[in-house]
């Protein structure tokens, strides 16, 4: 007879079978020699529901017999001031000192 500690607890799978998709590897031909290149095509509203809206950048990890797609979070938009400072970093040392002096004057005049 088994003890309480040796009975496996039921668990839910990480991915529901209703969320699984079945794809077939097709091919795309490459000009000029029309070489067949393996290709996967994915489309459907389920992509957006899964976090892959149009324009989403995707990280692709490839392993033997396995491809993992991960939607990347959009980077927050950089402020106009930060963009200007990034451009100022590309200026000559003399011009950078002028920018620093200007910022010091502006910061001091509250």
Curated annotation (Swiss-Prot):
Alphabetical list of InterPro entries matching this protein: SpoVT-AbrB_dom, Toxin_SymE-like, TypeI_TA_SymE
Tell me the Pfam families matching this sequence.
SymE_toxin
Key words, A-Z:
Cytoplasm, DNA-binding, Endonuclease, Hydrolase, Nuclease, RNA-binding
Q: Which PROSITE patterns match?
A: SPOVT_ABRB
| One annotated GO biological process | RNA metabolic process
Reported EC number(s) for this entry are: 3.1.-.-
Record's GO cellular component terms: cytoplasm
Signal peptide coordinates: none
On whether Hydrolase is a keyword of this UniProt record, the answer is yes
Report the GO molecular function annotations: DNA binding; RNA binding; RNA endonuclease activity
Record-annotated SpoVT-AbrB domain positions: 29-74
Localization terms from the record: Cytoplasm
What broad class describes the main subcellular location of this protein?
cytoplasm
> Out of the domains of life, which is the source?
Bacteria
What family, per the record? Belongs to the SymE family.
Instruction: State what this protein does.
Output: Involved in the degradation and recycling of damaged RNA. It is itself a target for degradation by the ATP-dependent protease Lon.
The molecule here is called Endoribonuclease SymE
Report the source organism.
Salmonella typhi
């Amino acid at each position: 007879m088994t003890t309480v500690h040796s009975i496996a607890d039921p668990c839910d799978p990480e991915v529901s079978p209703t969320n699984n998709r079945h794809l077939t590897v097709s091919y795309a031909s490459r000009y000029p020699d029309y070489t067949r290149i393996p290709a996967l095509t994915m489309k459907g509203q389920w992509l957006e529901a899964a976090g892959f809206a149009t324009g989403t950048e995707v990280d692709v990890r490839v392993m033997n017999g396995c491809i993992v797609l991960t939607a990347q979070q959009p980077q927050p938009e950089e402020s106009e001031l930060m963009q200007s400072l990034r451009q100022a970093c590309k200026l000559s040392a003399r011009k950078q000192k002028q920018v620093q002096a200007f910022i010091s004057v502006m910061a001091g005049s509250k």
